[in-house]
Amino acid sequence: VKDELAILQRISGANPKHHGWNFVRKLIDCFTVHGPKAEHQCTVFEALREPLWLYRRRFVGNVIPPDILKILLQMILEGLDYLHSECHVIHTGTGKASAVNHTAADSNADLKTDNIMIRFEDPAIPQEVAHDEYNEPLAQKRLNDGRVIYLSRNDFGPLRKPTGVVRITDFDRAVLGTGAQSGCIQADVYRAPESILDAGYSYPADIWNLGVMV
């Protein structure tokens, strides 16, 4: 957790004047919740609408039109340029995974449609959703120990504008690019050549991931 917070703080404040700063998720705050059995580190981020894989379902054939895709790709590339040139951060990382024990869960480290998020195109939407939840709350499950599990809202209605602004998210496995990194990254069939050859990887691994995603 400490390593992730350090990465997030670096991303949030490296250079807000860089245009790509607008296309990465920034840390707003962090705090610790003391529970009956453990402490929980909590992080606060901007509320976002939906991941790119869900966003593309809004278009015919689940395909983002080329004119919109070009705009989104420009944002993603500018966000990656900010991460690489200003923050010296590689999104693709191994975290605690090893070259031998690479699991499906480790793919969270890869740049993909799950962690490219679309911002709310209208700042009024979260307020409207909160109002709806207050008046007509979704299903809740109350446990015997008094805790309540709330059903998440993941449908915020039709888009009010066709093109959203992207945010690159999920930096829990990100690593610093100040030196060559090693280890097994990415899913087997999409793995970058340098990783296959165990030759170490750096910023180009993120660009490879973007190409695979597209």
Predicted features by range, described:
Residues 1-214:
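Intrinsically disordered, low-complexity regulatory segments of kinases
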